[in-house]
Amino acid sequence: MIARQPIAVLGGGSFGTALANLLAENGHVVRLWMRDPEQAEAIRTRRENPRYLKGVRVLPGIEPVTDLAATVSASELIFVVLPSSALRQVLQPVSALLDGKMLVSTTKGIEAQSFKLMSQIIEEIAPRARIGVLSGPNLAREIAEHALTASVIASEDEALCQAVQAVLHGRTFRVYASGDRFGVELGGALKNVYAIMAGMAASLGMGENTKSMLITRALAEMTRFAARLGANPMTFLGLAGVGDLIVTCTSPKSRNYQVGHALGQGLALEEAVARLGEVAEGVNTLRVLKAKAEELGVYMPLVAGLHAILFEGRTLAQVIEALMTGEPKTDVDFISTSGF
């Protein structure tokens, strides 16, 4: 069925464009939906996304479109590549058209008011849809430039996982499957917060030992928090956990890392986000994550420290000093070691 129908990609940003190219390379007809008619026309005529993925050719099998209802009606497989703040606004008006469709979320964010992940919001909007999550260490430009990449498709629906693997798997892109949709999606959302701190540390010239400490303790915090919410902690040792955390916290191509780097150079938060020109989900996630951690009583000193830097006037040096002088804790305390 999918081979005879266009595949829809909702969102014309850098990742949506890179994902559309992957699908087109594998011989699929792709409808790349975006709200901005001028952007759609620019891609249609120039065969490039000049705003978000300049210099990367948009393949002929991709049709930029702006009619959302027609796009979702014509497709059985729909990749949702929208900013978290826009997801409800975009999908709610076409909810009646989504029954039975395969909806795959790629957005790594958390809704502020409800603390819902994106696939949970999609499930609320389209309760009869088949839902999955695509996540992992997937920098859009590297995918577009054919760097060897692996990702995870997570869903309780095995047939959906197999369908996504079939359409995306190629010579430079490998897709693994997981049944832990919640854990995979949570890992993708949480790591954005720590990438901001990693970017700041790099900007301030902190050493490799420091960067390694931040990444490792970030993994401990993420996993501790996820386990408290009922996710499988072992998921965080895979591509969607430590894999995504490493690439996001070490690459200047990461949007959240770029925001942190700009903050380390002395820019205000608003200036750093404006310089980026795209959405950095980590800023929004940080606010809700700190509140949720306090509500649940989960120990997350890096989250509290970054919140103090961004919103309470503290410096990174002050936060790191507080971390270093705090009471010593157990290293790996989020996975039971009984039986080892």
Curated annotation (Swiss-Prot):
Active-site residues, Swiss-Prot/TrEMBL: 191 (proton acceptor)
Cited SUPFAM superfamilies: 6-phosphogluconate dehydrogenase C-terminal domain-like, NAD(P)-binding Rossmann-fold domains
Positions bound to sn-glycerol 3-phosphate: 108, 136, 191, 244, 254-256
Enzyme Commission identifier(s): 1.1.1.94
UniProt keyword annotations, A-Z: Cytoplasm, Lipid biosynthesis, Lipid metabolism, NAD, NADP, Nucleotide-binding, Oxidoreductase, Phospholipid biosynthesis, Phospholipid metabolism
Catalysed reactions, as listed in the record: sn-glycerol 3-phosphate + NAD(+) = dihydroxyacetone phosphate + NADH + H(+); sn-glycerol 3-phosphate + NADP(+) = dihydroxyacetone phosphate + NADPH + H(+)
Pathway given in the UniProt record: Membrane lipid metabolism; glycerophospholipid metabolism
Signal among keywords: no
HAMAP family reported for this sequence: NAD_Glyc3P_dehydrog (MF_00394)
Organism per entry: Azotobacter vinelandii (strain DJ / ATCC BAA-1303)
Gene name as annotated: gpsA
Protein name listed in UniProt: Glycerol-3-phosphate dehydrogenase [NAD(P)+]
Major site of localization recorded for this protein: cytoplasm
Gene Ontology CC entries for this record: cytosol
GO molecular function: glycerol-3-phosphate dehydrogenase [NAD(P)+] activity; NAD binding
Function per UniProt: Catalyzes the reduction of the glycolytic intermediate dihydroxyacetone phosphate (DHAP) to sn-glycerol 3-phosphate (G3P), the key precursor for phospholipid synthesis.
Domain of life: Bacteria
Alphabetical list of Pfam families matching this protein: NAD_Gly3P_dh_C, NAD_Gly3P_dh_N
GO biological process, one term: glycerol-3-phosphate biosynthetic process
Protein family membership: Belongs to the NAD-dependent glycerol-3-phosphate dehydrogenase family.
Cited NCBIfam families: PRK00094.1-2, PRK00094.1-4, PRK00094.2-4
Subcellular location: Cytoplasm
Record: residues binding NADPH: 14-15, 35, 108, 140, 255, 279, 281
Coiled coil stretches, renumbered: none
